[in-house]
Regions:
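A glycine- and charged-residue-rich anion-binding loop/surface
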Residues: 1-209
Length: 209
């Protein structure tokens, strides 16, 4: 993961003032798994593009942006760009995404291991976590979950990632999103002391370190 890189444009198109850009390599993280995409800038000579979203279409990462200086032509788009991610925004996304992992672990501790993630939304400002349970949570249960999550945040748990075979990852106890299709190798995000992690999930998103 990096927040700045020199990049080349593979292809682009413009529609009503909005550029859709495919880069040869990209520091921008695309929206996926409920996590919103990165924003930032692309600068080459006198051309400046404000990237307001990054999405993934058929496994291709696409930056969507608008020209803020200069003009996008085949010539100006053919140069080398400096791609810069809005890193402060990304830090907030990291925090909220890691919080959803802590939240799921806390929910399973308080409500039971039947709790399964059904969806999520992670942005710099808010997070939403959808999960299955038999009934509405009581005020006492909500408070217990909140206390656990806050305690884990204050404990500054170590966070590490591993690339593992998907079957080995699931066998190790890593949580997977029900119905999600995974490749042969997956990224596992672990929070807590090695061997006794509080949270262990299959996840390709951004997290605190």
């Amino acid at each position: 993961e990096t927040d700045r890189a020199d990049v080349k444009v593979l292809r682009y198109r413009e529609d009503k003032g909005v550029l859709s850009i495919v880069l040869a390599t990209s520091p921008f993280y695309a929206e996926m798994g409920g996590q919103v995409g990165d924003k930032g800038t692309l600068v080459s000579g006198g051309l400046e593009i404000s990237v307001f979203d990054t999405v993934k279409v058929n496994d291709t990462s696409i930056c969507r942006g608008k020209v803020t200086k200069g003009e996008a032509t085949p010539e100006t788009m053919g140069g080398t760009f400096t791609a810069t991610v809005d890193n402060e925004r990304r830090k907030d996304i990291r925090r909220n995404h890691s919080a959803t992992h802590l939240l799921q672990a806390a929910l399973r501790e308080v409500l039971g291991t039947h709790v399964q993630q059904q969806g999520s939304f992670v942005s710099p400002e808010i997070l939403r976590f959808d999960f299955s349970h038999f009934s509405a949570m009581s005020a006492e249960e909500i408070q217990k979950v909140e206390n656990i999550v806050n305690a884990k945040v204050m404990a500054c748990l170590p966070v590490c990632t591993d690339i593992m075979n998907v079957d080995e990852a699931k066998a190790s106890g890593a949580m997977a999103l029900f119905g999600e299709k995974y490749g042969e190798d997956v990224r596992v995000v672990k929070m807590g002391e090695p061997g006794c992690e509080f949270s262990r999930e299959l996840c390709g998103g951004l997290h605190v370190s």
